[in-house]
Curated annotation (Swiss-Prot):
The gene is TMED11. It is found in: Endoplasmic reticulum membrane. Keywords: Coiled coil, Endoplasmic reticulum, Glycoprotein, Membrane, Signal, Transmembrane, Transmembrane helix. Part of a complex whose function is to bind Ca(2+) to the ER membrane and thereby regulate the retention of ER resident proteins. PROSITE patterns: GOLD. Glycans are attached at N105. This is Transmembrane emp24 domain-containing protein 11.
Amino acid sequence: MPMLAFALSFYFSLSTAFYFHVGEREEKCIIEDIPSDTLVTGTFKTQQWDFRRQDFLESAPGLGMFVTVTTYNDEVLLSKLYGPQGRFYFTSHSPGEHIICLESNSTRLVSFGGSKLRIHLEIRVGQHDLDAAIAQAKDKVNEVSFKLEHLIEQIEQIVKEQNYQRDREENFRMISEDTNSNVLWWAFAQTLIFIAIGIFQMKSLKNFFIAKKLV
C-alpha cells in the first residue's frame, strides 16, 4: 500500500484548513510536531469525482475514511473508521512528531483517471474549545444512551417472555383444574348411577321373589 507523506508546519493553538487529492484506497499522511498533553482536533470531508459531470460531488455516499494517528515510537493514539465526513480527537502523550493518516475503505478498483477523491481537512492543535468538549461529551452520551436503550429492550423482551410463560402456566392451571373438576363430577355421577342401578336391581329382585312367593 503506497504511503504518501508530507510535512506541514502549524503554529500552536492555530487552525489550518486545506484539501488534497488521493486515489481510492490511497493513504495520505500528515506529520505534526505537537507538544505533550495537547488536544488535537481534526475535521474532514470527502468528495468523490463524478465522471459524467466532470466535477467533484458534494459528498461520497457509501465511502468510509479510516483515520490512524501514531507517533514515531509506533504508539497508536487513534485507529478508527469513520464515514465520508467526521471529526476525530486525540491527545499527545509526549512532545514530538505525530503522523496523521487518512485512507478510504473503498473496495472498488482505482480508476485510470488519476486521483478520484478530494479530502478537505482541518487540524486544530492546542485548542481545547467548548465545541470539542461538547462533541466528545455527546459521543459518550450517545454511546451510553445506545447501550441503555439496548439494555431496556432486552429487559422488555425478558418481561414479555415471563408474561407469556405466566399466561401459559395460568392457562395450563385453569385447564388442569377444569379437567380435574370434570373428572370429579363424572366420577360422582358414575357413583350415583351405580347406586341407582343397584337400588333398582335390588328392588326388582325383591319384587321377583315376592311374585314367586319365595319370601
